[in-house]
Amino acid sequence: MVYLKGQIRKALSGFYYVYADGETYQTRARGNFRNRKITPLVGDEVLFESDNLTDGYVLEILPRRNELVRPPVANVDLGVVVMSMVSPNFSFNLLDRFLVSLEYKDIEPVIYLTKVDLLDEPQRQQVTEIKQIYEALGYAVIASEDVEATKELERFFPERLTVFMGQSGAGKSTLLNQISPELQLATAEISQSLGRGKHTTRHVELIPLYDGLVADTPGFSAIDFLEMEAVELPKQFPEFVAAASHCKFRECMHHKEPGCEVKRQVEAGTIATSRYENYLQFLMEIENRRPVYKKKS
């Protein structure tokens, strides 16, 4: 048996397709992974053994930098948050959920706004507002419908593993098809009853694009903060981190404490009210969630 190091590019029906040295190997996971309740993920760097391209075994998963649950991908560098301006309507709350989740996983976010061409002039003011708020925080915001927008996005891909996420029905599959027409991914219809897109993507696969790898992923429109402790939340807001050194209390949660610099900057208009209100809502969600009890093994 030959021992090799590679990366899982696709997982399907119990098989893991591992890319190594220009070849793709079909492998299975050894039974001891199941016994240890470890599941190999797309994006994992692995050690595996194989004598041919169809009968390999994954032996070891190398340490992960991060992992996402939805979609199940490991070692992600860049998260493109695709947000629709209309149908479904734009939501500051949802965008901030995605950004907080990415910051927590140490994944660089890029904000991509779709359906900008459907807006009238008053609605376009919101695009300007979004750009002002988030570019000031250091986030890239792409907001146009032409070839230039996809070109702007492509410059982020080289040497990175990129995941697309965002509102269901916001146009993630459409966007990926524009970037790489050979993908021919199914695009979502908007559900009349929910006002949200129906999920069209079924399994995750890493596709080599522009000297990087891109995962096509389901478009979930709700994110919860199951893993995060309340004290971690303020650290995921860059503007809070910058202000916190001037708060009266070192572990200030920017809620009820006196002498809070974050609250002062919100009142002064330096920190966006929408960001602070969303922070308070997320904080309440974390504090009110039921404890997760792990079963004894």
UniProtKB/Swiss-Prot annotation:
Manner of cofactor binding, per the entry note: Binds 1 zinc ion per subunit.
Subcellular localization(s) per the UniProt record: Cytoplasm
Coiled-coil regions listed in the entry: none
Domain spans labelled CP-type G: 65-223
Cofactor: Zn(2+)
Annotated EC: 3.6.1.-
EC supergroup of this enzyme: hydrolase
UniProt-annotated binding residues for Zn(2+): 247, 252, 254, 260
SUPFAM superfamilies: Nucleic acid-binding proteins (SSF50249), P-loop containing nucleoside triphosphate hydrolases (SSF52540)
Keywords carried by this UniProt record: Cytoplasm, GTP-binding, Hydrolase, Metal-binding, Nucleotide-binding, Ribosome biogenesis, RNA-binding, rRNA-binding, Zinc
GO molecular function: GTP binding; GTPase activity; metal ion binding; rRNA binding
Record has Cell wall biogenesis/degradation as a keyword: no
UniProt: GTP binding residues: 114-117, 166-174
Biological process annotations from GO: ribosomal small subunit biogenesis
Membrane-spanning residues: none
Keyword Metal-binding: yes
Source organism superkingdom: Bacteria
PROSITE patterns documented for this protein: ENGC_GTPASE, G_CP
Pfam families assigned: RsgA_GTPase, RsgA_N
Record GO cellular component, one term: cytoplasm
NCBIfam families in the cross-refs: ribosome small subunit-dependent GTPase A
Oligomeric and partner information: Monomer. Associates with 30S ribosomal subunit, binds 16S rRNA.
Protein task: One of several proteins that assist in the late maturation steps of the functional core of the 30S ribosomal subunit. Helps release RbfA from mature subunits. May play a role in the assembly of ribosomal proteins into the subunit. Circularly permuted GTPase that catalyzes slow GTP hydrolysis, GTPase activity is stimulated by the 30S ribosomal subunit.
Homology family: Belongs to the TRAFAC class YlqF/YawG GTPase family. RsgA subfamily.
Name of the protein this chain belongs to: Small ribosomal subunit biogenesis GTPase RsgA
Organism name: Enterococcus faecalis (strain ATCC 700802 / V583)
Gene: rsgA
